[in-house]
């Protein structure tokens, strides 16, 4: 499967500003993710939830059941939520 664009709903940049944790790697909210971010990746795992940090767990009651997802309209682009393994490397 080839990923062309990814849309995210959280706004966390990978910078080391004091208001953000340095162990996170996330993307700008509502923007197309350029292909160069995933150019060297061979495998991307698709999961049903976003973890705020690689070492934290998301409570089960906050995860949307896959049967409860809204139907996409004609003009709504499909989206997916990704969790990247800690052993993947960004160049």
UniProtKB/Swiss-Prot annotation:
It is found in: Plastid, Chloroplast. GO terms for cellular component: chloroplast. It comes from the Eukaryota. Keywords: Chloroplast, Plastid. This is Uncharacterized protein ORF91. It comes from Phalaenopsis aphrodite subsp. formosana (Moth orchid). The lineage of its organism: Eukaryota, Viridiplantae, Streptophyta, Embryophyta, Tracheophyta.
């Amino acid at each position: 499967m080839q990923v062309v664009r990814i849309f995210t709903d959280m706004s966390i940049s990978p910078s080391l500003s004091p208001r953000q944790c340095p162990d996170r790697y996330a993307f700008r909210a509502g923007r197309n993710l350029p292909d160069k971010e995933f150019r060297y990746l061979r495998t991307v795992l698709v999961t049903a939830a976003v973890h705020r940090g690689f070492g934290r767990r998301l409570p089960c009651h906050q995860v949307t059941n896959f049967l409860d997802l809204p139907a996409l309209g004609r003009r709504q682009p499909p989206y997916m939520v990704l969790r990247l393994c800690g052993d993947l490397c960004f160049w």
